[in-house]
Amino acid sequence: MTRKSKEFRMVGVNDVRDINQTVFLHLIRERQPISRADIAKFTGLRPGTVSAIVNRLIKNGLVYEGTEGPSSGGRPPTYLYINSESFYVLAIDIGVIDTVFAVSDFNGRILQQRSVLTEGEPDVFLNGLADQIDSLVKSQFSRARFAAVGVSVPGLIDRETGSIVSSPNLEWNDVPVRSVLETRLRLPVYVENDANAAAFSELWYGPIDEASVRTLLFVLVVEGLGTGLIINGELRVGSRFGLGGFGHMSIDPNGELCSCGRRGCWETFASERATVERFHRVTAKQGLPVLGIQELIARANKGDEMALESLKITAEYLGEGIANLVHGIYPEAVVVGGNITAAWPIIEPIIRKRIHS
């Protein structure tokens, strides 16, 4: 068997400079306010090298200096901060029911947000979405200030092409998301699985201390169920097509048919869809209207026994699946996201008990 040879190239001075600038931006974002001396301590670089890179970041408008920060008296030290207004980013979250798109600054603060229904053929939908984004940008922002577009979608992603390989819940296959949106928006487009994007966002912008928590499991409970994994502070995405969806690990080979074509996937027991369907199997006999997950949770919070029971069963299955992953991955933190967290006081004790049992 022959093995395909890898391509190598020499790393030049410009490559090293770009890498160092990226490292500095990440460090400043994570620990701002931070001094040049602290950057030198963290990176092991000489003070002169640190100052040269920092000055370049300041010149490019990505970082600014200030004196608001910890001081031990005397002349206040100079600290570095991310310039949140240096550029904007477009964020798009394509969901099964609706799609949310937003404009954020360099610090991740959302400036504008809109939502549209996810409907129609993929190409028609993406072009219509681009029209709405264009309208928002033209009315309130300068296009020159935008750096890139980030897109999160449920399903299997080809990161090299920015295409959706397969999204059973969306019923999209081989959809060239990057190609369509780059052509229309004239910006670089990056496509990622929704659970992976959520895990990365939690690490960067959530309440978790990034410096102390280096391994994190994110469980995204939406129409389907996805997982994102951070190990040693880095998103683990596996091969070109992803690490694999733990939401499609089978916990009952004789269970219900999943949208992926297999039976008894974790998703068929613990997703929003599973929770709602469980509720309706009981209430349909009583002639109650079909509810979404938010309405179901509202009923549960008011004491509706059938809604409570449906959520509690979901919590049992969530806890069971998370326990299996925890015992194999040993994350320092587990985060659950999605609409179902509106029922957190109901489901959290059950999930926790299941994990620790």
Which residue ranges define each predicted feature?
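ATP-binding/phosphotransfer module of carbohydrate and carboxylate kinases, centering on a glycine-rich
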Residues: M1-E68, S72-L117, E121-R145, P207-A211, ...
